[in-house]
Amino acid sequence: MVQDGTGIDAAGMLAGRLVIEVTDTPAAAFAAALAGDFGAEVVVCEPPPHGSGLRRLGPPAVHAAWWPIIARNKRSLAIDHDHPGALPVLQRLAARADLVARDACAAGSRVLEAAGDSGTAVDMHLFATGADRPDLWAWSTRPEFAAAASGMMALTGEPDGPAVQPEMPLADYCAGMMALSIALAELRAGRRRLCA
């Protein structure tokens, strides 16, 4: 058992907190998985019939290994965000949420819209490098760009050799970890605002 300075079991520091995950990219999903590691209840909102796009990330050979890693400590809610009956469900869920982990997918915005003015969740909104300016950097949302721009690719490969793309989305993992750190500070301070 790992304890922080207060004597609280670190694995349960987020016990009683609700995290809603609405994402198609690894960064926000990894942040939500870390929140689950610390005891938060994490609910992944997935569109039927195939679920989150993260279930199919990468080549078919890695699907079976990838999803259990990113979906650990989470529960899944199959919900069609465009269905009229989804709004009351999202409103109830959003009213209880402490944190919404989302990316540029439209469904994440619908969860926050459902919360309306009564929403009190910290909004952890992550998006790929360059997604805010696709007119300038149409290719910059690719994970290879993020790994190169962040310096992650320079840390891999042979000395004096070319850079090597890591097997895992290392830049996404770092972004998710940093975003969750900011969100935890916001939760600790009791502030509810856009934090990443």
At which residue positions do the language-model features occur?
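N-terminal helix-loop segment corresponding to the beta1-alpha1 unit
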Residues: 1-194
